[in-house]
Amino acid sequence: MSMSFSGGTHNDRWGSDLASAGEFTQSFPSLPATYSPSPSSSSSSGEELLEVTIEFPSGVIINIDSVTGTGTDISGTDLEITSCSDSGSGSRSLSLGWSASSERLTAGTNSKQQIQKISRRGYGYSSRSAPEPVVPHRGEITDSVNLPRALSQRPTRPNRDGSGTERAIHGLKFISSKENGIVDWNDVQNNFAHLSKDGYLFKSDFAHCIGLENENSKEFADELFDALCRRRRIMVDKINLQELYEFWYQITDESFDSRLQIFFNMVKNGDGRITENEVKEIIILSASANNLSRLRERAEEYAALIMEELAPDGLYSQYIELKDLEILLLEKDISHSYSLPFSQTSRALSQNLKDRRWRMSRNLLYSLQDNWKRIWVLTLWFVIMAWLFMWKCYQYKHKDAFHVMGYCLVMAKGAAETLKFNMALILLPVCRNTITYLRSTALSHSVPFDDCINFHKTISVAIISAMLLHATSHLACDFPRILASTDTDYKRYLVKYFGVTRPTYFGLVNTPVGITGIIMVAFMLIAFTLASRRCRRNLTKLPKPFDKLTGYNAFWYSHHLLLTVYVLLVIHGVSLYLEHKWYRKTVWMYLAVPVLLYVGERIFRFFRSRLYTVEICKVVIYPGNVVVLRMSKPTSFDYKSGQYVFVQCPSVSKFEWHPFSITSSPGDDYLSIHIRQRGDWTEGIKKAFSVVCHAPEAGKSGLLRADVPNQRSFPELLIDGPYGAPAQDHWKYDVVLLVGLGIGATPFVSILRDLLNNIIKQQEQAECISGSCSNSNISSDHSFSCLNSEAASRIPQTQRKTLNTKNAYFYWVTREQGSFDWFKEIMNEIADSDRKGVIEMHNYLTSVYEEGDTRSNLLTMIQTLNHAKNGVDIFSGTKVRTHFGRPKWKKVLSKISTKHRNARIGVFYCGVPSLGKELSTLCHEFNQTGITRFDFHKEQF
């Protein structure tokens, strides 16, 4: 069908739902207000006229040649057939007129509804000259009664020219491909110089100029040329160098929204409609641009969802208006943002204007408030080391050997004293059972147990420094001075230490003191180097076969060299040259208690791990190489949410123990852990348990499961723990912010499960107290009679388990869509059971461009439609909405700070160090500028 409008003083653009085929054109020439109607019009003087020509596929033409009224909206007028005329070929054309005073015709009701639809849609198509009326050759309307039938007799599948949209889809694939053959701009410039005539490049040479040589590509290049011209509203067959650069810049723009814009410009040369298969192709391309393999697999389902939404009336379920899709995909969303309240903003601005000295003192004060635990511990440590160093320096400065060896001897002995102290102290932070116990005491309020591993690393730096100073002072200064001393000085000051015969340099080294010292230096340097972050995390890539010298295994086994170091240290300490009295050989005094404590812990852990017998109940291997092990809970195994255990699998390694966060709740009757493959040991775990798993379920690519009963036996598993972690202190805060990156979410899953169990228990107790519970008691640790509300009110308060945490905000940031499967169960449980909104969950998928970016608009639309229809997020497969990109952490903290004024909020983080530093800095800034306080805690492994 084609429609042609002509009239005066009407500048509206109309869109048509009547059009089923052909093209739709409009023309509104600029005419004066005294426009005279055509002779054929039947309107009176002063009326505005509008002529509408509608051509149906059957050949029928309807002329609407009179409109009464000056309003631009025709939807409120009445429809009346004013004339009918036969064409020369025997077909009949109808002339319809709208008149405010005309009599409403029943036969025209359906037509009026369709015309009203045109007015409501209001789409703007490119303005072109109206074609000459086509004389129909078949089909005619004999009277007005047949008009509704004629309007409704449209083909179920329009006779459209599909090549336009299909070529545009092909073009979208083409420019999205990295192997599209488009050359560099310098080559394009050179091609322009050879192909241009008088500074212009003709359309016929455009394909060759941008490097498209074959015939199919040339046809596409011509379509592309026309589309780019239409976008710039120019209709030319040649372009200059500047225009060519603009064309080339858009073609090579890798952003998906730029490619979509080209697609829509190419498709507009067709019929303005797009099919379900074509929508599917766009979804596939959008999913590829955002690295979403699962979305590609369900592209057909989501394409049908879009078709259903954009064509709700069902008239053309296999087509939608292209304009709808274009507006949807290329229109930027207004993203919600959180800003600081005006009072906080004003306060921050005023503070910047104050004296710099005052601000520095204020920052120092806030730093002391945030880090006072660390500060007093480190201060005490430095004071002790300084006192030991000076005490030993003073002691040896009054020895006879000082007259020969001088301050080299003093420096060596001072360093040795701090070395002995630190070799004893470094064992305490790794006595995990002791630290776990101390966390539950009053010491946790003044000692930063969260920083045990960091303190352990800091002490190691002090040990290496003291060791190098001690060894260098002896080997490079003291020994040469002994050899260079005069016979008189030697006999007077040194003979009582080294004997009558002056030793040689080799003789000084080739003694128990020298040999043990050199071996200790070598072993400690090896252990220290392989324990560094770059080696332990395998960030330093070495060529084969030296690649085995880095990684966790190298760190783990090299640390066992330190057992030998402690033995050698005792031998070294009792074989001193300058001390012969046993009570002055103090190395054993420093080491006695810490070594006994550490050895006792190791023995205790060995036997306890054998007593904790666990049976594997369920194994699930998720995409992304994550193994979930659910095992029976030992009877005496008591733990807190947020803690972790060490795991050993003898079939993989009989010596290696690895820490993993517990992901089950203390109230559950089982233990569960999540293990992600990152090294040799975790790879061995995956292989060992993959053997007993079933094949993947339909629709769950890569998912392996194994449940009891199972024909094959599971590999043996040993556990040791539980051990304390920063996350276990969440109960101290009324409001907590939990932030996990990837597998770093595992410490917080146990917390979420624990909170959920408490929420459910609290709801059950509330129902019982209100009289809605019909049971006589609740079978739990906090059971009580529930016969009526009065009886419930008599229950002691100590027997009621209250929920300390009032609000929990969980932010999970992951790169892979399949990661959401790991904790799908708990997320759905929270969404179903948390009626009061205690837990607020936010999932972020970083492989998708952030919200508001046109490259993710299509995905946002599909996500919204599917959630509205099915209540499920298309990315996570849960009821929790997935956000795109990365959270704006400053806005997140600002939102929480505004919502919970004067509160003390615990921020718990597990992930890469870079984000941990950012969150720590933001917490420090908010503590300075706001009235809400954030306490930052980072998981250390």
From Swiss-Prot:
PROSITE patterns: FAD_FR. One of its GO terms (molecular function) is peroxidase activity. Its EC number is 1.11.1.-, 1.6.3.-. Residues 232-243 are annotated as: EF-hand-like 2. Residues 103-117 have a biased composition (Polar residues). Residues 609-729 form the FAD-binding FR-type domain. Residues 29-48, 103-166 are annotated as: Disordered. The modification Phosphoserine is found at S346, S350. Residues 254-289 form the EF-hand domain. Residues 196-204 are annotated as: EF-hand-like 1. It is a multi-pass membrane protein. Residues 413-570 form the Ferric oxidoreductase domain. It comes from the Eukaryota. Residues 1-374, 429-514, 579-586, 753-941 are cytoplasmic. Keywords: Calcium, FAD, Flavoprotein, Membrane, Metal-binding, NADP, Oxidoreductase, Peroxidase, Phosphoprotein, Repeat, Transmembrane, Transmembrane helix. InterPro entries: Cyt_b245_heavy_chain (IPR000778), EF-hand-dom_pair (IPR011992), FAD-bd_8 (IPR013112), FAD-bd_FR_type (IPR017927), Fe3_Rdtase_TM_dom (IPR013130), Fe_red_NAD-bd_6 (IPR013121), FNR_nucleotide-bd (IPR039261), NADPH_Ox (IPR013623). Residues 396-407, 536-557, 605-731 are extracellular. The chain crosses the membrane at residues 375-395, 408-428, 515-535, 558-578, 587-604, 732-752. GO terms for biological process: response to osmotic stress. One of its GO terms (cellular component) is membrane. It holds the Pfam family FAD_binding_8. Residues 36-45 have a biased composition (Low complexity). Belongs to the RBOH (TC 5.B.1.3) family. Monomer and homodimer. This is Probable respiratory burst oxidase homolog protein I. It comes from Arabidopsis thaliana (Mouse-ear cress). The gene is RBOHI.
